């Protein structure tokens, strides 16, 4: 009473008041009229009425009061980032050093006691702890310690402490009577000598807007006792900012402080207190829990320190992306909800409206106008970067508040916009997963949402938002036609929110992916579009929002009226496509402000293509778009690489660029090249052993997987079919000296040894077409010279070992780099022609022996042949044990033709079925890969069902025996069996040994080079020198036992590697498959070779196979080998007009006549090799094949330019692992 202050009813502690000086300086003339109004307000009679008639107190509405300690707590916590106002005043004395810690605590305690006493005259309007003489260093220490000086305020008529709340918003005073709202007790000013008139105004204080307007014109007026420091009076809507001359102008502080501070300080205070800085401004004024200890208690300080330690560093590292576009739609009951309409992992997938299913992935096509509107939207919309929120209601609340402050929406639309953002989300897979029992996602009403997800500020965790009921009031209806919209349940996270997730889609999303949610839609209550771009501080899992449980990092919200020209769907697709772009996605992670996002959009526009608005009749009209797009992407990558190099050259690496260096960087260490020469004898062999053999234990462990079992069964049939086919043909060529049994034994023995000792155990050793051609040529040479064929092979094998040792010692494997596709195509084309020719030649011989005659021999002649030891549809006896095969049999030629063509077409179309659209990918692969065994089985059954027609069968001995026991044994004497082997031939055998070495070297090393491609991602390495040494040395062993020489079979080896390849499941729909790993081990090779060896016991079954069926397989191998050779494609272009030529580099970068010239050179080499092969000098055809290597590197550069040779003779083909891709025959340039 002595100080002129009347305590409020209930004993509430009043705010400290400042005495008014009795003598005031004269007022300026422009404010005298306002002084009269102020005098009426502060009249003595008015205070007498207030004293005599105190206002009635309603116990049901507890009041809220703030003491000076509350404001001190606000200034000394981390929410108040600016310096105290008293620091702006001139210091009364010189700054002093900080006292010891104990002295500081004593002084704080003393100052705490002073805060409850009214200030003396002359003190600043707002008291600061420590005064102006306290160093700023002490304030930093107090902020780090997280100490709080707030004391509980006793509410009137209550025995329990009432929590002080600071609510945020500008619409508070317009919604009185809300539950839970506390009335603020305003202090009464001191009575001055000029307040002698009766009051003319109401006792209630004016509204904050009126007070702000009045104070705006009183800057020059000295301090008035009517100044108040209530937070409600300092708040303002966003529309009041930036309008100095309007009625809504706000001032950052009271008149007295404004008089003592400069304009720069006032602008800084206005920016801090009145403006909004998204991502920086703290929206919460939160007091610590009442259960914490006092300011000096270590137990009360520990939780604050723990919270500070838990704060994580900002993660600016770009992650993989998953984008989901949700549009605001009405369901069947006309209730609004968010409906997923599109998604992006790398390409766009849209939901088809009619069928509610996902369409095919495609490259998103955007309109140029939508991109410009998006850029303008981000430039003028809200951008909240590094937002520290972990719940959808918290994010939505801050987004709505930011929209209000930025004048995008009105304050009265707060509730409607918030309810719209919290509507439930639905996805196309929801109904599919429910089946006959559609699920009903759990949702709650508005009150339960607020109660469960928004605890009070005193006890809530960090980042919690104030109670939205304080700001929303009665929620407005979302849609005009639905007056009961406030009763509709909102969609909030539930326990089983992801029951309808698609597991298949989840497998295609990378593990470290972070999602982007795009929300767009039309609402009737907004007058203009409102948008917000949000980047969370860390990715959080917002349940039931996305189709799959992926943590969300980015959100984009775009709401607006329907009467605008903005296409919200196209704008949502634009931002979603931008977020799926790699460079823009990285820029969004690294952006520090709005301008970085705008710059990233400009970069995206620089790499985009605008197609004129014209009708496109066919795909040929868009052929140039892909090439132009590739050129733009190349320039874009060059710009990014230049930026990275400039950043690295500057001595530092920008945050977020480390990933780019890791992925595409030039900082990678050079790999260990297995073909690099060491300069020492057997240096390459030693490196192969040291590189590969340390992985031997893992080669055994890695085989313990079911995929290896499936690969064994598959490759077994893939290896057995060529062994039977080539074995039967080899028996025909060598007159039974080597046949099926010898080839099966050789494949089994050499396969087991190579798998156990080889450097690349994934290679499959086997017989091949070039070796068959060489065996035929060497057999004819021995017959012409009257030499023993098998004895000559012994000496050829011994010389082969010598040459292989010399080649490996000199590290000659590097020569494989000089074998270009020019030579490989000639080699493969020649072998394919030989296969096709031999097939029809064998068929011609069948028609010659069994011609189509009008009259055939009588039945007795056929019966006589049967009595001689032949069955009508059985196997002929060995040629040496019975009479020659019968001739002139009816229908034999026609049935052989049917069996051959049937086998070929079944195997060929099953291979084509592999790339068709029928069935699933895995089923098609299995059927296509087993095409040869299936065709053989079908034709054998057809032949077996026809009992009255004779067909020549495969000659297979019983048990483990040679094909012709009367001609040879398992061991071949080196000096001759029937007669002595001539010594000159022992020396001359070095020539055919050199020729067979050429074939083995080319096939083995080229196959190893294909398997070791970087695209196949083999981690354990390979060994060219060790593999060549093993195959060559085992060739010498084969000569001693009369077994065929083997080499690395290209097609079978590549098929083996593909069968053991594990593909990544986290691949975006529409993207090309990527290899996760290859199960490199030795066990599958050992098992495959062992099973092929055990097939010798199936002699009874093998003897049922007609030779015509093997001719069909031979034709199949020749035709399929031609399909993957570029030479055959260029050969067809000779007969095709230029306008129908495909878009290939060898067509677009080379003139047509020069391309045909290159093709004719290759055809000339093939014709020369064919002529040599058809003469007595056929043994020399490997040497002529080797001469094509110097022809390519010495002669062709004189005829063609380097760019032309690069287009015509470049090895740019990569393995295709797509289920619908090409098969191994189309990828390889090597013969079968």
UniProtKB/Swiss-Prot annotation:
Q: Which Gene3D superfamilies match?
A: Helical hairpin bin (1.10.287.570), Mannitol-specific EII, Chain A (3.40.930.10)
Its record classes its membrane topology as: Multi-pass membrane protein
Ranges of Basic residues composition bias in the record: 76-97, 104-113, 280-289, 305-316
Q: Which UniProt keywords apply?
A: Anion exchange, Antiport, Cell membrane, Disease variant, Ion transport, Lipoprotein, Membrane, Methylation, Palmitate, Phosphoprotein, Short QT syndrome, Transmembrane, Transmembrane helix, Transport
* Residues in the Cytoplasmic compartment per record: 1-708, 911-925
Disease with which this protein is associated in UniProt: Short QT syndrome 7: An autosomal dominant form of short QT syndrome, a heart disorder characterized by idiopathic persistently and uniformly short QT interval on ECG in the absence of structural heart disease in affected individuals. It can cause syncope and sudden death.
Q: What is the recorded name of this protein?
A: Anion exchange protein 3
